[in-house]
């Protein structure tokens, strides 16, 4: 997807350009799943892909460290003219406040939810963060394939080893070609089913 705007700086937000600490507030409260998964193990970066509900990749970018809220925020804000209606993300509980503090008007109509698979580990998060909560009252959300991203990410694992031996320039090109083929196959399958 082409870039539609630049990511602004937010000088009134302390640490806006610092490392992303996840959903932890100043008292150390918040979503502890984020910290226990990424903070302790200091996971390295890789690819962050944005998937539609049909597991077609809208785009990707390389990240140097573990994926954080800023990566997702920046991808959404710089590539979509209008914010998506629904964002299904592993750590939507931390992403929603991060986005709303920075661009409240842009994200005012966006629903941020945690997919069914990842919701299990979010023991401190309220039910308002879970897709299943909204499915009970909004039938259209029952049609959302909340595992589309996981399906797509499992496809990316096919090239993980090969890409790890390439220069960054070649790895990006290889990934772009892989995802183009992946997307074409998904789209053809959908056309065949209709």
Each PLM stretch: what is its role?
Residues 1-194:
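Catalytic-core elements of nucleic-acid end-processing and repair enzymes
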């Amino acid at each position: 997807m082409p870039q539609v705007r630049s990511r602004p700086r937010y000088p009134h937000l302390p640490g806006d350009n610092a490392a992303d600490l996840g959903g932890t507030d100043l008292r150390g409260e918040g979503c502890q799943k984020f910290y226990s998964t990424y903070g302790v193990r200091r996971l390295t970066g890789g690819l962050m892909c944005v998937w539609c509900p049909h597991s077609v990749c809208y785009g990707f970018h390389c990240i140097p460290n573990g994926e954080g809220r800023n990566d997702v925020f920046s991808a959404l804000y710089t590539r979509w003219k209008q914010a998506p209606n629904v964002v299904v993300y592993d750590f939507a509980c931390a992403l929603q406040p991060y986005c709303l503090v920075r661009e409240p008007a842009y994200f005012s109509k966006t629903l941020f939810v945690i997919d069914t698979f990842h919701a299990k580990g979010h023991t401190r998060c309220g039910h308002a963060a879970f897709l299943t909560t909204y499915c009970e009252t909004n039938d259209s959300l029952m049609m959302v394939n909340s595992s589309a991203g996981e399906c797509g990410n499992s496809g990316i694992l096919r090239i993980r080893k090969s890409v790890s031996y390439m220069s960054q320039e070649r790895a990006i090109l290889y990934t772009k070609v892989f995802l183009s083929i992946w997307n074409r196959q998904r789209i053809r399958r959908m056309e065949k089913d209709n």
